[in-house]
Each structure stands twice: as structure tokens, then as C-alpha cells.
Amino acid sequence: IVNRDSRNEMWSAVVATYTRALLDVTAQVHAVALEVLRAEGLLPAAARVDAADGTPPRPPQLEQLPLPGIPSSQVARVTSRMRARIREVVSERGILSTIDHVAELAQQHSRAQWQQQLRAAMGIDVTVGDPDLGLQVRAFRRTNTDLIKSLVDEHVDRVRRVLSDAGHGTRVEEIAEQIQAATGATESRAALIARDQVLSLNAEVTEARHAAAGITEYIWRTSRDERVRKEHKLLDGTRHRYDDPPVVDARRGERANPGTYYQCRCQAEPIIPGFDG
């Protein structure tokens, strides 16, 4: 059996890399949102609105500034401008190259994990070539490009709701605090995306490697910590076929292989024919 701590450390590093990248995107989104709101006169140029991890004191005279009700036409103009500017900035920062870098890191860790599994099963170092993983990598690229676009759109929609709900006499402080809360929600969503997507890519690449080696069965392995789902904990150490996955959510009756269910950190330990006795 491959050391679980070593295996988890490998993938935690990839998740951390992607999380940092998406949080950087979130910071860019936050900065552009403030830039547009200040340009529209909805926030004073000197007002401080920090990201969700801290709120330094703001000048009292700015906190108490009331705003008139914001016309729906202005809300539409602001959010349209904000959306376009954010997409431009995110594109300039080369998010596609970041996605590709994360995919390459995932493949490297998957390769190392595969070598460890072969060594554990066969007792010797075995060098094997990589299968064609182009399908999995292209799907990861496409899915994550769409997810980042949705991350931007969701943030702009949150800001739009803040502006639409601002009535006559709403203070700058209230708008600033609500935008800060919106940024915090976007940060949480970014972290979830990073973790789920890396885990899913690992599962898909692992299955492709196993299929290329003629492996059709696996042992379900969990991380054995307090975050493991009850159903998944019961599966730990059980044997399954890739083409007949077990039930992973009894309430919904959903079946899945390790790592393919939402936020699942479990992994498939291959059963290598001739070395499974």
C-alpha cells in the first residue's frame, strides 16, 4: 500500500498551487470592481475596501457619506463595464497558462504515484510510459476556463445585487461592507473549485493510467481523517471494478469511482493482475 501521508502531500501541493492562482484571480476581480465603482462615483476615491481577510479603519467622514438611490440604468452600466474589464484583466494575467501548468503538475504527481503503486505491488522499480492523456487535459482546460468565467460572473452578480438593493440614503460604509462580503464568498468559491478540480483530474488521469495497463479493478482508499464522508469511510479497503462503481451517496443513490464525486479525496489503489494475491 502506498503511504497515505505521502500521497496526500503530493496532491495537497497541487491543490495549494491552484488555490493560490484562483485567489489571485479573486483579488484582481475585487480590485477591478472597486476601480469601476470609484469611476462611477459610487465609492470615494480615498475609501478603503480591503479583501475579506481584513478591514482596516476607514475615515469616519467617508463612512457616513449617504448615497442617493442608484438608478437601474446605472447599475446595468456599472455591472456591464465591470464584467468586461474583469475579463480583460484576467485574460491579460494568463489564466490559461496557469490552468495548463496545474494540469502538468497533476500529471507529474500522478506519474510518481503510479510508480509508487507499481513498486509497492511488484517489489521492484518499473518504468512505464505515459498513456495519451490529451483527452483528460483538454477537458480540464475547458471546464476550468468555464468555471473561472462563472466565478467572475457570480461576483459581478453579487455586486449588482448590492447596488440594486441600495436605497436612498445608503451609506458608503454599507456598500463597502457588502462588497467585501461578496469578495469573501468569491474567495470561498475559488478554493472549492481548486480542490474539486484537482481531485477530479487526479481521478480521471489515474483511471486512464490503469486502463492503459489493463487494470480493471481497484481497492478504495480514503484519507482516513474526520472529513471523510460516512459512505466513503465504509468503502475504505473494499474491492471494486471501474465499470461498476459503488454507491457513494445512499440518499441520492449515486455511484462513482474514487475522486470523481464532488470534493471526494479518496483514491483508487490498483489491483494488478498477477500481483493481487
Predicted segment positions?
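Acidic, glycine-rich two-metal-ion catalytic cores of nucleic acid-processing enzymes
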Residues: G184-A185, R189-G277
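N-terminal leader/targeting and assembly helices and adjacent pre-domain segments
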Residues: I1-A185, I272-G277
